[in-house]
Amino acid sequence: LSTWLNSNNVSDSVSRLNIGLILAGNIPMVGFHDILSTMIVGHRAMIKMRTNDDVIIPELLEKLTEITPEMSDYYAVVDRLTDYQAVLATGSNNSARYFEQYFSHVPMVIRKNRTGVAILGGDESEDDLNGLMKDCFQYFGLGCRNVTKLYLPENYDLNKIFSASLP
């Protein structure tokens, strides 16, 4: 973590802010990076969990607080965001429109749906295709950066893709 902080020129003299975090809930613990990034630079993470991912992160934060009790000053798991000076929210393209309007009075970063694209040349190895299929199907394809679109050369042998997608 020190190497990461030092390589990103994070100042020790940051004014502490309450940062509202609306976490994605499509993959377990997908929002932990946002929490860690907020806390490690000295801000307080005001965490709004998604109902389908509201167990592991609170348990992890509780365990981390048992190890380092002062950590409790750097986060709060909340049902509703209040008293925040900036927001980082992740959601669908539709919810992003709502977030942009609702949080327009503070600095914000709003993440929307994203997708990954793979362009194949036709000379990929079996290992390459196995890795590609892992990326397509990891987390049941729910990750915002999972490959969801393939561009294939004309007359590509689709059996290569089908074989790589089977366990």
Task: Give a label for each model feature.
Residues 18, 68-150, 154-156:
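Conserved NAD(P)+-binding/catalytic subdomain of aldehyde/semialdehyde dehydrogenases
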Residues 57-60, 99, 161:
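Hydrophobic packing residues within well-ordered alpha-helices of enzyme cores
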Residues 36-37, 104-105, 165-166:
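Short, solvent-exposed amphipathic alpha-helical segments in soluble enzyme
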Residues 42, 84, 117, 161-162:
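Structured N-terminal alpha/beta-domain signature
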Residues 4-65, 71:
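Conserved small-residue-rich beta-alpha loop and adjacent elements
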Residues 154-167:
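Internal helical hairpin/lid segments
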